C-alpha cells in the first residue's frame, strides 16, 4: 500500500487559509473582489444546489432525494463565492462512509464560470483532508470518462491492486 502512504503525505497538498467564521478561504487570481470559502455546513438551499447542477448540465434529481442524500452523507463540503455581503454557491461535494475505513466521494461540481482555475482541485484536496482527519484511509469515487485524468492528477488510480468496482441495477 505504498500508493496510499504517498497519496496521504501531508506535505503533498497546500491548504486553504482560514476565512471568517471558521470557513476556509481559497485565494483567487481573477482580479475582482470575490473570495472563495469552503464550509462543511449542511444547511444549504437545495434549489441553489439544483441551479449549480443545472449549470453543469446534470440531469435533475428529485429535491426530496437530494435532501435525504445530503442529510445522510458523512461529510458535505460547499464552496461559496463571496462578493461584498452576497454569497453564491459555486462548488459542492459530499462523501458517504462507514465511519472507520472507507469513504466514497459523490457529486463533485464546480460552477462552469470557475472551472479550470484550480477550484476543483482545491475542493478535492479539502474533502480528502477532512476525511483523513476522521482517519478514513480508503477514499473512492466514480468518475465520468471526461474527468478521469483530473482525478488521476490528484492521485486517484483505476483498479488499484486489481480491485474492480461493480454495480447492481434493478431490472
Swiss-Prot record:
GO terms for molecular function: N-acetyltransferase activity. Transmembrane segments: none annotated. Its EC number is 2.3.1.-. It is an enzyme of class 2 (transferase). Keywords: Acyltransferase, Transferase. InterPro entries: Acyl_CoA_acyltransferase, GNAT_dom, NSI-like. GO terms for cellular component: cytoplasm. Residues 36-171 form the N-acetyltransferase domain. Belongs to the acetyltransferase family. Ycf52 subfamily. This is Uncharacterized N-acetyltransferase ycf52-like. It comes from Synechocystis sp. (strain ATCC 27184 / PCC 6803 / Kazusa).
Amino acid at each position: 500500500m505504498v500508493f496510499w502512504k504517498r497519496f496521504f503525505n501531508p506535505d503533498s497538498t497546500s491548504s486553504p487559509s482560514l476565512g471568517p467564521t471558521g470557513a476556509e478561504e481559497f485565494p483567487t487570481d481573477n482580479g475582482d473582489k470575490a473570495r472563495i470559502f469552503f464550509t462543511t455546513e449542511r444547511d444549504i438551499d437545495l434549489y441553489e444546489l439544483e441551479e449549480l447542477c443545472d449549470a453543469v448540465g446534470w440531469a435533475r434529481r428529485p429535491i426530496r432525494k437530494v435532501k435525504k442524500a445530503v442529510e445522510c452523507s458523512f461529510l458535505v463540503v460547499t464552496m461559496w463565492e463571496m462578493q461584498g455581503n452576497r454569497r453564491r454557491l459555486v462548488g459542492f461535494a459530499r462523501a458517504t462512509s462507514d465511519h472507520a475505513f472507507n469513504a466514497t466521494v459523490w457529486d463533485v461540481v464546480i460552477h462552469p464560470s470557475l472551472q479550470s482555475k484550480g477550484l476543483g482541485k482545491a475542493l478535492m484536496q479539502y474533502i480528502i483532508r477532512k476525511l483523513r482527519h476522521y482517519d478514513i484511509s480508503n477514499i473512492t469515487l466514480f468518475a465520468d470518462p471526461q474527468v478521469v485524468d483530473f482525478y488521476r492528477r490528484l492521485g486517484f488510480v483505476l483498479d488499484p491492486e486489481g480491485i474492480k468496482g461493480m454495480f447492481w441495477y434493478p431490472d
